[in-house]
Structure formats: C-alpha cells, structure tokens
Curated annotation (Swiss-Prot):
It comes from the Eukaryota. Binds 1 metal ion per subunit. Its cofactor is a metal cation; thiamine diphosphate. Keywords: Decarboxylase, Lyase, Magnesium, Metal-binding, Stress response, Thiamine pyrophosphate. InterPro entries: PDC/IPDC-like (IPR012110), THDP-binding (IPR029061), TPP_enzyme_TPP-bd (IPR011766), TPP_PDC_IPDC (IPR047214). It comes from Zea mays (Maize). This is Pyruvate decarboxylase 3. Induction: By hypoxic stress. PANTHER family: PYRUVATE DECARBOXYLASE (PTHR43452), PYRUVATE DECARBOXYLASE 2 (PTHR43452:SF39). The gene is PDC3. Its EC number is 4.1.1.1. The keyword Metal-binding applies.
C-alpha cells in the first residue's frame, strides 16, 4: 500500500473515468503516447497536436474547449515543464467557472526534451503546483486541488473530482523522473538521430 504512483497506473484509472460526455486533451510530450492508448467511448472528444511539437498549448486549449462544448467535462494531461510555459491561463479558466479536470504530471523536468537531447537546460525549477493554483484562485469562485503520490491517493482524488466537485479540479500527480513510456524513448532516439544529421548541402 501507498507505493509510489506509476504513470501507467494513473492511466488505468483514467480509462475508467471516460464517458461519452468527456473530452481528453493530451499535452505535447509523454501525455501524447499515454493518451493514445486510451479506448475512447463513443462521443468522447480527443484533442492533441503533434505536428509542431509546441509545448504548453494544452492549457489554452483547455480554456477554449469548454467554451465551445460546455456539455463536455474536459480532462487534460499536462506535464510540469509544459505547464510552466502557459500556466497563467488557469486564471481565465477559473474566471470562466469551468469544471475541467487537470492531471498535472510532476516528474521534475522536460522529459520529452531529455529524450531528444539531454542537458542542464532541461532541468526546471519545481513548483508547488497545487499551491500555485490555490494562489490564483485566491478564494474567489470554486476550485479544488489535490496532490497525489500513491494509487490510494489517486483513487480518492478521482472519486472526489467526479462525485463532489462541479468546478475546476487540479490533481498534481507526483511521478518519478524516469517513469517514461517506451514509445517516448523510441521516438526520442529517432528524433535525436535525425537532428544529428549533417546539413544537406545545397
């Protein structure tokens, strides 16, 4: 009991959350590969972008999606590095009183960038992410945050988010920095090899 939470266990529980009234937003990074394994119920929305590899896009997308489809409860999966790029949009999400669920996967760095080309620039300052959202909330309106470190924590947080909270639910998932999907490892090595090619003479 209370063993460290693995990302594949997170997505096992996420699968059970999905209904035709849900929508999934997958941030650039390992969330791409984990969300692609989900089996979407009929009617469940799904948004991701891979063409440009733009990190941080999902927070703005999470703001926009419910504005156009307010019958869906949107569930977003965002890495800590990506979140730091566009985190301020949470303020507008709160002002618009949206009831989305954010799973913030805190593994202490830009995992996708590490797999492509490692270096000290991929180390980020760790935030207290739940504290950050609580500060933006500032006691005005409705918001609920939780920090989870084990499967037991996770199941309790999901039960609360789905059962009691018709507001923004922000669940910070503490994950090990090396807890990475094999798909990301394979993809990162291919991109790294492509980036290492000599220039094509014109």
């Amino acid at each position: 009991p209370n063993e460290p939470l693995r990302v594949n266990v997170l997505f096992k529980h996420v699968q059970k959350m999905l209904t035709g009234d849900s929508a999934v937003i997958a941030e650039t990074g390992d969330s791409w590969f984990n969300c692609q394994k989900l089996k979407l119920p009929e009617g469940c929305g799904y948004e991701f972008q891979m063409q440009y590899g733009s990190i941080g896009w999902s927070v703005g997308a999470l703001l926009g999606y419910p504005q156009g489809a307010n019958h869906k409860r949107v569930i977003a999966f965002i890495g800590d590095g990506s979140f730091q790029v566009t985190a301020q949009d949470v303020s507008t999400i709160l002002r618009c009183e949206q009831n989305s669920i954010i799973f913030l996967i805190n593994n202490g760095g830009y995992t996708i960038e590490v797999e492509i080309h490692d270096g000290p620039y991929n180390v980020i300052k760790n935030w207290n992410y739940t504290g950050f959202v609580d500060a933006i909330h500032n006691g005005l309106g409705k918001c609920w945050t939780s920090k989870v470190k084990s499967e037991e924590d996770l199941t309790a947080a999901i039960e609360t988010a789905l059962g009691e909270k018709d507001c923004l639910c922000f669940i910070e998932v503490i994950a090990h920095k090396d807890d990475t999907s094999k798909e990301l490892l394979e993809w990162g090595s291919r991109v790294s090899a492509a980036n290492s090619r000599p220039p094509n003479p014109q």
